[in-house]
Regions:
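Membrane-interface "cap" regions at the ends of multi-pass membrane proteins
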Residues: 1-38, 83-85, 91-94, 189-193
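Extracellular loop-to-transmembrane helix junctions
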Residues: 39-97, 106-133, 238-246
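Loop-to-transmembrane helix boundary motifs in multi-pass membrane proteins
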Residues: 90-93, 127-131, 214-244, 319-356, ...
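Hydrophobic alpha-helical segments and their helix-loop junctions in multi-pass secondary transporters
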Residues: 124, 157-182, 249-257, 379-392, ...
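C-terminal membrane-solvent junction of multi-pass transporters and transport-like membrane proteins
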Residues: 151, 330-341, 376-418
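Helix-loop-helix junctions that connect adjacent transmembrane segments
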Residues: 153-208, 415
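Extracellular/periplasmic helix-exit of transmembrane alpha-helices
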Residues: 218-223, 232-274
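Small/aliphatic-rich secondary-structure junction motif
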Residues: 467-527, 540-542, 549-551
């Protein structure tokens, strides 16, 4: 009688299929949208004397972009704030991740408000329309759409083109004489500068996707390197963001002074206003109106994509922390589509709550900077003080200097914007309380030991048990739940004296904001549904004399994983059941059986049991 075999987890790695063009488009969907509202907020902060502030913010943005090229080169598996700060301290990493959570909450609300404004919704109805938009995003994400940034990718080129057209139409009307110097003291100018720091928002996105970027030609999966890919993705986007913001700001400030009230009223959709005005002046009034509508649609959809990105990233950060033991494990529970339930609810409810508690767009923008600046500062500070990173003295100096500037900005925000300070403290307080509760439940404590003792504690323990398989055919069965297809597979394996590989793929459709520190390989014993299936099959296999090999995988694409495992394990026959998904789920996620049939190698027979 064959002995039942308890299989080890099958590790599934995300493919590195994001080239520099796709990475640049994804980055532009986050970073490139900042100009849609930054220049309007600059005018509200300093009026016609805001050009020096815009120049200073763009200069800082360029320096931060250079810093993130360095970060991406040293963190090819994910260089977000959580991954970078974790090398210094788990507590610091959690604090940085919570600041990122605060950033994503306000990003969803602010980008949604700007999106509906660009699409023509009035200021009076913008709050309600934004809440509805966020709810729609939540409903879509309940079914777990992949985080591909498809809208950003398709709209990146049109967005760049309309920016170039606005600058071209305004070129003949740019005036140096209309630019006013700063009228206030350094302290007042610094506070105004801090209020326009939102141009940095989105740059963190590139560090979070290094784990799926294509490797450089001179690297390998064992020694990954994405310096070239990251550089080619960051540089063009940084150039467009910096020069686009400067030129659009110059175009805004070149308008006559009597346009001041109109500029203040259009702070949420400044690019649409500039497109209407300069398009009408350059060609004809009807063209200006049409061009303004086109700009509104392009940037409205791009900002809608930014809302979706923020929601998905917020879910991913909370899920990653829960998987890593920094949040209660209940936050990692998934719905039937592989999406974390409680993080999804929080990602929808919290931005709507912030919308309800803020008075207007300016108040919302005031909450924004505290999260994004704090997260970037923690990331740069952790890297600049990390002696294990092979940084040159110039790189470390630039990174440390940028950290000091951002730290000063964060302190200024805390001093001058009490609402932002209260918001950040609330997110940090609630998050760290949940972290303490999670550690208490799991029995984790913090100990201080010598380096010699710490070096002896390594996660790579020797493997003491290896599966023993019978020679002969291999049959693989993939099923969701206990159903007749499992009995059919057992009968086939018993008849053919074959090894039966029982595959359970746990779908986790979550965008990981960074690369978490995995605490051991995934085990089917820890998943209730997989445990029920595998235990039953091991018992039945032992009674029938069938060698059963459990195979457990965690993946965002069940069909691709099943096909990959079938080919890798060299099975002769794959048995699957008919799809149990509804029509709406098939529309959003696709049919698993169809995907398997289209991609399975011809040498493997496919049996669909219905």
């Amino acid at each position: 009688m064959a002995e039942p075999v308890i299989g080890l987890a099958a590790g599934v790695h995300r493919p590195r299929n994001v080239d520099w063009k796709r990475a640049a488009a994804l980055l532009y969907g986050d970073w490139g949208t900042s100009k849609a509202y930054v220049i309007g907020l600059a005018f509200v902060a300093a009026g016609f004397s805001s050009f020096p502030i815009i120049l200073a913010v763009c200069a800082l943005t360029a320096v931060v972009g250079y810093n993130y090229i360095i970060i991406c080169s040293h963190f090819p598996d994910g260089g977000g704030v959580y991954s970078a700060a974790r090398k210094q301290s788990r507590f610091l990493a959690s604090a940085g991740a919570l600041l990122l959570v605060a950033n994503f909450i306000v990003t969803a609300a602010l980008s949604g408000w700007a999106a509906v404004s660009y699409l023509g919704v009035s200021s009076e109805n913008a709050r309600l329309a934004t809440a509805g938009l966020i709810l729609v995003v939540g409903i879509i994400n309940y079914f777990g759409p992949r985080h591909s940034g498809s809208v950003s990718i398709w709209l990146a080129v049109p967005a760049v083109l309309v920016v170039i057209l606005i600058v071209a139409f305004s070129g003949a009307h740019l005036k140096i004489a209309e630019l006013e110097p700063a009228h206030s003291s350094f302290t007042v100018t610094w506070i105004q500068f801090v209020g326009v720091i939102l141009a940095l928002s989105g740059v963190e996105a590139v560090a979070n996707i290094t784990g799926v970027m294509k490797l450089d030609p001179d690297s390998s999966p064992d020694r990954p390197k994405v310096t070239r890919t990251a550089t080619k993705a960051i540089v063009p986007v940084a150039i467009e963001v910096v020069f686009g913001t400067v030129l659009l700001g110059w175009a805004m400030l070149s308008l006559p002074k009597f346009f001041g009230p109109q500029l203040a009223d259009h702070k949420e959709d400044m690019l649409r206003f500039l497109a209407e005005h300069y398009g009408g002046v350059a060609i004809a009034p009807w063209f200006g109106t049409a061009f303004g509508i086109a700009v509104g649609i392009v940037f409205g959809l791009l900002l809608f994509s930014a809302v979706n990105t923020a929601v998905v990233a917020l879910i991913g950060v909370v899920f990653m922390m829960a998987q890593d033991g920094e949040m209660p494990r209940q936050l990692a529970r998934l719905n039937r589509h592989g999406v974390p339930q409680l993080p999804l609810l929080a990602a929808i409810a919290l931005p709507i709550l912030v919308l309800a508690l803020t008075s207007d767009f300016n108040a919302l923008a005031g909450l924004y900077a505290v999260g994004v600046v704090g997260a970037i500062a923690v990331n740069l500070g952790s890297c600049s003080f990390n002696r294990e990173l092979a940084l040159g003295w110039f790189q470390r100096f630039i990174m440390g200097s940028t950290f000091l500037v951002l730290f000063a900005v964060e302190v200024t925000i805390a001093k001058t914007k009490p609402d932002a300070l209260f918001f950040a403290c609330s997110v940090l307080g609630i998050g760290l309380t949940l972290r303490f509760y999670s550690h208490k439940l799991s029995g984790l404590t913090t100990l201080t030991v010598t380096r010699k003792v710490a070096d002896m504690v390594v996660p790579n323990l020797p493997i003491t048990m290896q599966p023993r398989l019978e020679e002969g055919q291999k049959i693989m069965v993939a099923a969701r739940g206990i159903n007749p297809v499992l009995n059919f597979a057992l009968e086939e394996a018993q008849l053919r004296k074959a090894v039966l590989c029982v595959v359970y793929v746990k779908e986790v459709v979550v965008y990981f904001a960074g690369s978490p520190n995995v605490r051991g390989r995934p085990r089917w014993q820890e998943d209730p549904e997989a445990n029920a299936i595998m235990s039953l099959m091991l018992k039945e296999g032992q009674q029938r004399g069938v060698c059963v090999l459990p195979v457990f995988a965690v993946s965002e694409d069940a069909a691709a994983t099943i096909v990959d495992l079938s080919a890798t394990m060299g099975v002769d026959c794959l048995v699957i059941g008919t799809t149990q998904r509804g029509a709406l789920t098939n529309l959003l996620r696709g049919n698993v059986a169809t995907h398997i049939a289209e991609n399975l190698p011809d040498t493997i027979r496919l049996v669909i049991f219905g």
